[in-house]
UniProtKB/Swiss-Prot annotation:
Annotated catalysed reactions: L-alanine = D-alanine
Name the UniProt record assigns to this protein: Alanine racemase
Source organism of the structure: Latilactobacillus sakei subsp. sakei (strain 23K)
Chain's gene name: alr
Cofactor annotation: pyridoxal 5'-phosphate
Xref: InterPro entries: Ala_racemase, Ala_racemase/Decarboxylase_C, Ala_racemase_C, Ala_racemase_N, PLP-binding_barrel
Amino acid sequence: MTVGYLRPTRILVDQNAIYENIQNELKHLEGTDTVIFPVLKANAYGHGLIPVAEAAQAAGAAGFCVALLDEALALRRANFTEPILVLGITQPSEIELAAANQISLTVGSLEWLQEATAIAQQVPYLHPVPIHLSIDSGMGRIGMRDEAELLAAYTFIKAHSDYFDFEGVFTHFATADDPDDTYFKEQSARFNQLMTALPERPRFVHVSNSATSLWHAACNGNIIRMGISLYGLNPSGNAIPDLPYPLKQALGIESELVFVKQVAAGTKIGYGATYEASEGEWIGTIPMGYADGWLRRMQGSTVLVDGQRCEIVGRICMDQMMIRLPKRYPVGTKVVFVGKSGDDEITLQEVADYADTIHYEIICDLSDRIPRVYTGLNEH
């Protein structure tokens, strides 16, 4: 994708915020042998894979989690040597590539192991691939669901140690960010029950996503898969406001006015002519649209200009949008979508609430054509 370096729209990423969020989690873990594997999937939740990995490494991350083998390989190409776990299912045909790059893979079934073995047997001098067995304790996504499945996979791995190294076992909680912990406790009990069936504990046993580490720390295994909290966002949204330590939001979004005009009452704005000026108004145009991730449902929300709230009027276009200004502002005036201006601030949570979604979706929808600008890490 072509990156729009020559227009004024920018995503601002504070690497120092990422550093501080990890440091605070490490303090939260003091006295334990638990380590942090930041979750860097989806371009580090839209923040930028390599710069976030650099900040996490500087802060003391012991390894990384990603969703795709491609993401793991990108980290290896950038000379990161820490352990990397692919949380999604990788095609068995890629076992040689994973082995050659010392990348740990998630396995959810005996069938995967059998297919991967048939491929591995054709590869001379294959280094054993580190395997993390996934237990489906109630998420309903991937993993072994009962003792028979788990033991069959474990037994197969031990019988084929030339190809596999039993490095870890894990589960994922569906409701760790919910004030009602009933189902969380059911999942936790189910995981512990299945763990007792294993003849040995591998090097890594992990259950904690961001929400689990924040509100159910007693359940922590020895890896925290630090996802959304790494980026300074509350996993629960507004549901559980109490946190064991402050989270510092790492991402901001800014642009500039590129066109300003005064319109008369009755003037219509945007596709579908859905907005009509009720009186004489100043209208500003911003070079950002739904192709950049600011979706059409954000019509009617506000941005900040000179510390003042300005409504998005008319339908958001693919590459541009219009706002109603309180007065004439010159072309080049800064516009804040996420961040502070004057005494006011727009948070990602506010944006998500308006869009009737979660902040995860807002940041992951941000297009790669918006340049990311990084600050802060040189302070450490």
